[in-house]
């Protein structure tokens, strides 16, 4: 768990490496201030827990994040409507986040992370505490996101078997050391 957190902290810039560099799009990200890293590299983060304001409705959670990232009202509304359709949220918009199922909450947090059209989407334990049907649904969402070729998805999860159906490359760490790397078939 500590190594997973360190990897995400290094990518997002919350922590600088002790040695070496983090390079994204041929730019040494560690030379940029942290606030510039998220915007320049268009990072999206889906935390293991949280990410929602539970007393707000689904639509209000989406609107809040959109207002932070998208200045023009018309563009905000277009992006929100696109995500509502993409994630099939139409019947859930007026439901408070606290009343959503675990899978619905996870889908909402992923949609919120996609508001700013990230180039890199970081998913922290996306399958934790979810039933098999919801896991399969999230795997499909991840595969669909990656199929566009416009986004890289980085997933940290303890359940490798859940990941192998939705990744083209896997790196397995044990005590901070790489013990396996390659395609899921390897």
Which positions does each model-derived feature cover?
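ABC ATPase NBD coupling module
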Residues: 29-44
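Conserved ABC ATPase "signature" region
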Residues: 75-92, 143
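Helix-to-loop junction immediately C-terminal to a conserved catalytic motif
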Residues: 12
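Catalytic Walker B motif of ABC-type/P-loop ATPase nucleotide-binding domains
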Residues: 121-125
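H-loop/switch region of ABC-family ATPase nucleotide-binding domains
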Residues: 157-158
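Conserved ABC ATPase signature
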Residues: 96-100
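Short, small-residue-biased leader/transition segments that mark boundaries at the very start
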Residues: 2-3
């Amino acid at each position: 768990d500590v190594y997973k957190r360190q990897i995400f902290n290094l990518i997002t810039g919350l922590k600088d490496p002790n040695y070496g560099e983090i390079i994204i799009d041929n730019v040494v990200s560690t030379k940029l201030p942290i606030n510039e890293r998220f915007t320049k590299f268009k990072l999206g983060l889906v935390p293991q827990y949280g990410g929602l304001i539970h007393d707000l409705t689904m639509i209000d959670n989406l609107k809040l994040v959109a207002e932070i990232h998208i200045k023009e009202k018309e563009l905000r509304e277009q992006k929100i409507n696109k995500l509502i359709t993409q994630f099939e949220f139409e019947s859930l918009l007026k439901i408070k986040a606290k009343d959503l199922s675990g899978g619905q909450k996870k889908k909402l947090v992923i949609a919120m992370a996609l508001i700013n059209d990230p180039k890199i989407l970081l998913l922290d334990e996306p399958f934790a505490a979810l039933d098999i049907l919801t896991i399969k649904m999230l795997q499909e969402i991840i595969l669909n996101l990656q199929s566009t070729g416009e986004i890289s998805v980085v997933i940290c999860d303890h359940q490798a078997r859940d990941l192998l159906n939705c990744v083209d490359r896997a790196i397995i760490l044990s005590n901070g050391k790489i013990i396996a790397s390659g395609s899921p078939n390897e």
